[in-house]
Amino acid sequence: MTSVLRGVLKTHLPRTLTLPRCARNFQTTTFLRNEQVKLPQTYDEEKVIIDEINENLKPDDLQASTRLRNIGISAHIDSGKTTFTERVLFYTGRIKAIHEVRGKDSVGAKMDHMDLEREKGITIQSAATYCSWDKDDKSYHFNLIDTPGHIDFTIEVERALRVLDGAVLVVCAVAGVQSQTVTVDRQMRRYNVPRVTFINKMDRMGANPWRAIEQINAKLKIPAAAIQVPIGAEENLQGVVNIIDRVALYNEGSQGETIRKAEIPEDLKELVEEKRALLIETLADVDEEMADIYLEGEEPTVEQIKSAIRRATIGRKFTPVLMGSALANRGIQSVLDSVVDYLPQPNEVLNTGLELQKDGSEKPVHLTPSSSEPFVGLAFKLEEGPYGQLTYIRVYQGKLKKGAYMTHVKTGKKVKVSRLVRMHSNDMEDVAEVGAGEICATFGIDCASGDTFIGQGTQQQITMSSMFVPEAVISLSISPKTKDNGAFSKAMNRFQKEDPTFRVHYDSESKETIISGMGELHLEIYVERIKREYGVDCITGKPQVSYREAITVPSAFDYTHKKQSGGAGQYGRVIGEMNPIESENKFETQIIGGKIPEKFLFACSKGFEDCLEKGPLIGHRVLGVHMLINDGQTHVVDSSELAFRTATHGAFKQAFLNAQPVILEPIMSVEVTAPNEFQGSVVGLINKLGGMINDTVNGPDDFTVTAECSLNSMFGFSTSLRASTQGKGEFSLEFLKYSPTAPQVQKQLIQEYQKAQAAKK
């Protein structure tokens, strides 16, 4: 008898997995109830299935899909995403006036609707809106999501990309590819999202789009080539040249709303031809049709170039690069045209769900973007609104109507769609129905982020896979200043339901409520929101690192739990071995001859889960352990599920402590940018923290250092950096990996833990 318990911890899943669309958080070869199921691993394989689905689509469904784009705006923090989105809304007529991030008019950008966002000048929550864009006498409907750039709010990017078909990656013309740009690229790959790239801030001193494109090719490892050349640079930026059709585009009017076409300036003609040749050459490397034209020495037509860009972009083999300045109102309209020309419509993306079988197994099923098919939708984001919980839903198949009923797949409950809205930041507009490929929101539904809904009476029980949720790396204790903590509990319940990376638990030993998250800013924002939205002042403890415990060598165990001193006894014996593994924790049994009944083995698996939550060394979670039980013994009277669960606890501790255990600490990727004159101070500061410098890039005015530092050493770093750079330096942190602590640190942590435990007795 063999049973395997998987998925207890997912911290060490490879971060560069290529995941199938919407079966999008299991690996390309997935084990479902011990049945191996092959899914498409490349877009070419996906395209075969997509073409088969499209052959059976009705003309109305094809027409609706052709005019629809679901896109996200993603980038490193301060690259200008929200400013870019504000221009998109203005040029599409969605808003009547432009307001800046942290603007002087106290209005702020439309998509940053929280007071905290407008005060701090950062995006905290992803905000959804929709708009229309006219091109070639056709009107296209965009569902648009602006996402945060700060790594602490990475879950907002995850859930946006989870339901989008394409994205605009915004890159700073001065800083180029930065740490969070790499993170966003990894997230796009995780969900197979094609992108067009916009190099922003071309009006800034030191802007260099060609260096940025080189970095996209080198650091993001995706072929990229410019489809535009800037007219002027820095403060003299006037417009761009479209190198495909060789036309100069100038933004005119008080807010760049008018586009004037003209001949290419004489001094740019040679550069345009050089970049056009490079574009064609790059496309020939990633597109077969363009390769044939290129090898035959022919000059491709404008339509052939555009078609090749579209095929290669949707196939995730290439990203076209545009350039301009959102703040200076230059080049935005060209990006909107490129969204239409090069990013996929819903019927060009393969969306896969899992059909639940009667025997409990799951079978992949490809969804059809048709409004006549049974409804399938995913709740990808929850938000507390003025009328109760607001649930954002992506419709993958069928249509959703106001007043209709749908079934919550996880619970089987029938729920009524009492109100259906399209969101425009924090404003909402009621609609009667939405079709396949659309994004909408509804009220009054009790669900969690990642839950699937299907149409009432649908024969197939289909579920969509959930999004990737990174592990929390930092924790702190929190308590309300007043004893009346009803509002405090309500806030805790709401926020952890809305944000999967915000975790709350009660420590029974310290009698404290502990909150965990992605970084100091992440937790600071929630503490501030509890105060503002619930009127509860909180006392917080010092931030604590979320350590992990692991083993380094195999260890055998033979443990007997025996309590036979009169009355009902307890007896359970387990024999086996424990091994270190690099993947998630794993529990396995290989019992021959039924020496231990199945119900007791299940109790052993529960005991294993118990032990993972609190390791033997310092009480932190355990990582990378494979526990195998291959023998044991029962007592005809005294054996029970409790006895074997307790025996597993003892065996785990015995084997763990004999396996040369280590304490792991989070290592962060740190990127610091500051003026060149402070380079020595910054490098010295990182060395003082015990950091390892990986790369240094010097620009005309600023330099950027990338390093690896332990999270524990980074507390208070912002204060030290301000002092070292006269307040002119900035930095970003991202979790990189877990690594063993120094022996003296491990010894100190164990001693402190043992001392604290002894004090509680």
Swiss-Prot record:
GO terms for biological process: mitochondrial translational elongation. Keywords: Elongation factor, GTP-binding, Mitochondrion, Nucleotide-binding, Protein biosynthesis, Transit peptide. One of its GO terms (molecular function) is GTP binding. Disulfide bonds: none annotated. It is found in: Mitochondrion. One of its GO terms (cellular component) is mitochondrion. CDD domains: EF-G, EFG_III, EFG_mtEFG1_IV, mtEFG1_II_like. Pathway: Protein biosynthesis; polypeptide chain elongation. Belongs to the TRAFAC class translation factor GTPase superfamily. Classic translation factor GTPase family. EF-G/EF-2 subfamily. This is Elongation factor G, mitochondrial. It comes from Candida dubliniensis (strain CD36 / ATCC MYA-646 / CBS 7987 / NCPF 3949 / NRRL Y-17841).
